[in-house]
Design a protein with these regions (language model features):
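Non-catalytic, conserved peripheral segments adjacent to functional cores
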Residues: 1-107, 123-125, 130-180
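Short beta-strand His + acidic residue motifs that chelate non-heme Fe in jelly-roll/DSBH
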Residues: 109, 117-122
Length: 180
């Protein structure tokens, strides 16, 4: 497994070791001891799976209380996955990092608590699966506007994204409730 630090402190890009043979492939998509050693602190308490059509953009989401660390990957298709640093005390506060995660490159991203998260679906359809370190708490959920100019995420968009009503009404970064 290869682990790389990204432009956002604590956001890690993970390249698992793939064991391919004439049957297909095998890899350990999470393993407590190895991932803990790499700095991916658990424990994980919830697994999620979403499916999105091309052009669907979900995010930028975070929970102001019960913040979630997320270990994310695309198990079908491809997405452009983004983490935004929302920790005022962080050296990379306000910065974002974006990476293509796909069923072909099998990359994963570790998004620690304190970061916002979102993704854009690049393929006709994408299955997105992730482990979370805290339970979903809708009362604490917050959404920052996906195209906030102060953050300036470089989404690889071809036209307008498809958004939920909640995401279309995301809060500007400058007005958002953030972490200390
Ligand atoms: C996130 C979540 C949603 N739901 C429900 C609420 C709603 O009826 C439906 C769809 O919810 P949403 O529109 O919030 O789903 P979605 O936009 O996919 O939300 C997710 O976006 C990505 C970017 C993240 O980082 C995740 O943490 C999560 O916020 O699923 C749960 O039951 N549990 C959950 O953990």
């Amino acid at each position: 497994m290869k682990v790389s630090q990204t432009a956002v402190q604590g956001v890690l890009l993970i390249e698992p070791q793939i064991h391919g043979d004439d049957r297909g492939f095998f890899y350990e998509s999470w393993r407590q001891d190895v991932y803990a050693e790499a700095g991916i602190a658990g424990p994980f308490v919830q697994d999620n799976h979403s499916r999105s059509a091309k052009g669907v953009l979900r995010g930028i989401h975070y929970q102001i209380q019960q913040p979630q660390g997320k270990l994310v990957r695309a198990t079908r298709g491809a997405v452009f996955d983004v983490a935004v640093d929302l920790r005022r005390s962080s050296p990379s506060f306000g910065q974002w990092t974006g990476h293509e995660l796909s069923e072909d490159n099998r990359l994963m991203l570790w998004v620690p608590p304190g970061c916002g998260h979102g993704f854009l679906t690049l393929s006709d359809e994408a299955d997105f699966q992730y482990k979370c370190t805290a339970y979903y708490a809708p009362e604490h959920e917050r959404t920052i506007l996906w195209n906030d100019p102060d953050i300036g995420i470089g989404w690889p968009l071809d036209g307008d994204p498809s958004l939920s009503g909640k995401d279309a009404q995301g809060v500007p970064f400058a007005e958002a409730e953030l972490y200390p």
